[in-house]
Curated annotation (Swiss-Prot):
GO terms for cellular component: cytosolic large ribosomal subunit. Part of the 50S ribosomal subunit. This protein binds to the 23S rRNA, and is important in its secondary structure. It is located near the subunit interface in the base of the L7/L12 stalk, and near the tRNA binding site of the peptidyltransferase center. InterPro entries: Ribosomal_uL6-like, Ribosomal_uL6-like_a/b-dom_sf, Ribosomal_uL6_a/b-dom, Ribosomal_uL6_bac-type, Ribosomal_uL6_CS. One of its GO terms (molecular function) is structural constituent of ribosome. This is Large ribosomal subunit protein uL6. GO terms for biological process: cytoplasmic translation. Belongs to the universal ribosomal protein uL6 family. Keywords: Ribonucleoprotein, Ribosomal protein, RNA-binding, rRNA-binding. The gene is rplF. It comes from Cellvibrio japonicus (strain Ueda107) (Pseudomonas fluorescens subsp. cellulosa). It comes from the Bacteria.
């Protein structure tokens, strides 16, 4: 069995887990998330503990059990505490402004870049060069952050662009004459 799947997921008191056949839903203070569990993975809900075991001895089933356990753990943490990602804009004239569910970015192009956030993701802009994205869904949050970063990825010579706040951009030396 997968080493990840061996450890059970503990469910806090504020989180409700519902299991209908192979569909699992997790409800908490930050929202509700759902997951379709693969047929080769068996989920047991006993008290405030979820355990995941493969239905057969196949190697793929072991891997699926570990993956499912990790996804469900992220769902439980997401609906109870939530996740956040911070992005930083580096460059002269690079600005960000949040209006409702739209992020307006000025990234040195001849036009402003408007990004509409999907449902379930909220945004804050503490300053004109910082973006804080928050969501209960870790996968969706990472996807949104990657899409915003892709508008102007950090370049290696001056480091200009949109980067994650903890990202280290490897710098190159300019060409010598």
């Amino acid at each position: 069995m997968s080493r990840v799947a061996k450890s059970p997921v503990e469910v806090p008191a504020a989180v409700t887990v519902t299991l209908n056949g192979q569909s699992l839903s997790v409800k908490g203070g930050k929202g509700t998330l759902a997951l379709e569990v693969h047929a080769n993975v068996e989920v047991k809900h006993e008290g405030n503990v979820l355990t995941f075991t493969p239905r057969d001895g196949a190697k793929q089933s072991d891997a699926l059990a570990g993956t499912t356990r990790a996804l469900v753990n992220n769902m439980v943490v997401g609906v109870s505490q939530g996740f956040e990602k911070k992005l930083t804009l580096v460059g002269v004239g690079y600005r960000v402004k949040a209006e409702g569910n739209t992020v307006n970015l000025s990234l040195g192009y001849s036009h402003p870049v408007n990004y509409v956030l999907p449902q379930g993701v909220s945004v804050e802009t503490p300053s004109q060069t910082e973006i804080v994205l928050k969501s209960a869904d870790k996968q969706l949050l990472g996807q949104v952050a990657a899409e915003i970063r892709a508008f102007r990825e950090p370049e290696p010579y001056k480091g200009k662009g949109v980067r994650y706040s903890d990202e280290v951009v490897l710098r190159k030396e300019a060409k010598k004459k």
